[in-house]
Amino acid sequence: MDRHCRVRAPGAARPAECPPPATRHAGLAARLGNARLLTLYDQATWSEGPAWWEAQRTLVWSDVVGRRVLGWREDGAVDVLLDATAFTNGNAVDAQQRLVHCEHGRRAITRSDVDGRAHLLVGRFEGKRLNSPNDLIVAHDGAIWFTDPPFGLLKPSQGCPGPQELDHHGVYRLPPDGGALQCMVGLDHPNGLAFSPDERVLYVSQTPEGGTTSPEITAFDWRDGALHNRRRFAVVPDGLPDGFCVDRQGWLWSSSGAGVCVFDTDGQYLGLVPTPATASNCTFDLEQRRLFITGGSTLWLLELQQ
């Protein structure tokens, strides 16, 4: 993808003003080492949807309200990859190293090709418009999984307000062969999602605004083409579990009001990576030596031990 516009010249990151990571778990302490959080960029309006783009060695993320998709490069430069977006939120990279996006405004899943434009993949389920696709992942088989809460319908700064045509907030699977979109489960304001390393467990955060459902990360077993054994996996101690990622050993790193919370495979809380502002999402690079965190106007970096 050709560079559209450079908004930050190459240069070094600067330390973020926040406490160091806190943990009593020896394994997590070893993974964190003496790392301190670094600020890579802080001129976005609302940072979300980080994804590592290995082909370009670039961290891609969204400035949702600013209607841009940005790219941080390893020399410190930041480029606008997509401009005047339809309130893009979640991003992912498929096996062909193409960028895939959730668009609040178009109420759709799109894919960016070499011309730098986002092309529609799916925007309807059983003839009705999707709500406001929020976050997505690409599975090993090439299927695209995404959440579809109504946030972009309710908040003008995050999308295009309009009537909700569907009677549910779904978690969907778009088959890799171009088959019909599948609604795998309905949840209360589903938000972030990720698979376990072996893709036998799907994690989805629920972030309801009011009502009787509490914010939590929910787990499902994925087998035989369906989700089974729904259960509460974890609750963050501060704020909401928005976006999250899972490392190679199966630990889940979740955004929260205080930073990034880390949970083991049983949902036990291991520790916290504090951030200066509420964290919205996080992801690793390919080697999982770097954790990228979005929140507010900012993209942060934490360099990890193997």
Q: Where are the language model's segments positioned?
A:
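Sequence-structural signature of mature extracellular/luminal beta-sheet repeat domains
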Residues: 3-306
